UniProtKB/Swiss-Prot annotation:
Belongs to the universal ribosomal protein uS9 family. The keyword Ribonucleoprotein applies. PROSITE patterns: RIBOSOMAL_S9. It comes from Actinobacillus succinogenes (strain ATCC 55618 / DSM 22257 / CCUG 43843 / 130Z). GO terms for biological process: translation. This is Small ribosomal subunit protein uS9. The gene is rpsI.
Amino acid sequence: MTAANQNYGTGRRKSSSARVFIKPGNGKITINQRSLEVYFGRETSRMIVRQPLELVELTDKLDLYITVKGGGISGQAGAIRHGITRALMEYDESLRPALRAAGFVTRDARRVERKKVGLHKARRRPQYSKR
């Protein structure tokens, strides 16, 4: 892929990271050499990926080439959305306020809380017995 007339954005969510390249085209989305429909079986994940493009009404004007690794389905979808948002802002800075208002620009910093010693999970304590 040539560097001319393409824009790039990196997105992260949980333990997933996505590299997104956008260039003028007809709306084809390729994720790890597979189509969006093949890569994400769940409609919810596909919808999350499409959100920034639908917001700025560029769904059928740009082609997306995406590589994503790490994490699960939900984290990868969120990372791709974040990457698409950053690439769109590089493509056209005037899109930033609309994307910001929708909450796509902000990186979701929530992570899995670590398990603590003496507890069953991160916060789940053993049952308390008074007697």
